[in-house]
Amino acid sequence: MAAMKRLLASSLLILLSGCSLMQPPIESAETIQGTTTVDAVEGDKSESNSGLTDALRNRTDPVAGDPAWAPIHPKGKPEHYAAETGSLFNLASSSSMYDDSKPRGVGDIITVTLNESTKAAKSADADLNKKNDASMDPLAVGGKDLTIGDYNFSYALKNDNKFSGSAAANQSNSMSGSITVEVIEVLANGNLVIRGEKWLTLNTGDEYIRLSGTIRPDDIDFDNTIASNRISNARIQYSGTGTNQDMQEPGFLARFFNVSL
């Protein structure tokens, strides 16, 4: 009997010690994203600095798969089971007849129509003209000119300065196309923070478009598109990498002489 009591006591101690070692469940976020950097249009330029090549080009190319631009993956919400009532109506899957399918949550997708066009012109003209004349008649004493040798006391000065200059500058830019981005954050006022990129691989290099900004759900059209001029704090980057991009830029010697001269 005593041995049985000792066995029960030891079993109880082992059970209590095992319960104390159990860790509480770890709460995971509803959204898994590759980065916490929200506003980073440039992102990480390259995986590793290529040294002399980047120094001579004075440019570091971005790379595809940048963690700052990684897509986010919302986790599935747990299902809530309700007692069966025999009704065919399911409140969880119901929607209002006045509601639409606009993106309103993290991970939703929206297409941005790029239609950017800017034009600036400036001209300036300047004309300056300054003219001075000064003279003095010969001094006369007793009706005769006062002289020293062959020179009298008189002078005549004239000064004429002119300056003329003109300058003109014209610049225009345009961009058209589309890019599909994701909602990465929902602000307290209901506005949506969007971010996304598109990479096109060519024979001798890559081209990419990156876009981020803040939009209003009311500005989204019925076909789930929004114009780029409706984006607040928009950052749009369109460029390329590789040989074609290198050929469009002057070399480091040309840049050096352009600056020094």
From Swiss-Prot:
It comes from Vibrio cholerae serotype O1 (strain ATCC 39541 / Classical Ogawa 395 / O395). This is Flagellar L-ring protein. One of its GO terms (molecular function) is cytoskeletal motor activity. The gene is flgH. A lipid is attached at residue 19 (N-palmitoyl cysteine). It is a lipid-anchor. Residues 1-18 form the signal peptide. Keywords: Bacterial flagellum, Cell outer membrane, Lipoprotein, Membrane, Palmitate, Signal. It is found in: Cell outer membrane; Bacterial flagellum basal body. The basal body constitutes a major portion of the flagellar organelle and consists of four rings (L,P,S, and M) mounted on a central rod. Its main location: membrane. Assembles around the rod to form the L-ring and probably protects the motor/basal body from shearing forces during rotation. GO terms for cellular component: bacterial-type flagellum basal body, distal rod, L ring; cell outer membrane. The keyword RNA-binding does not apply. PROSITE patterns: PROKAR_LIPOPROTEIN. Belongs to the FlgH family. GO terms for biological process: bacterial-type flagellum-dependent cell motility. Residues 37-67 are annotated as: Disordered. A lipid is attached at residue 19 (S-diacylglycerol cysteine). It comes from the Bacteria.
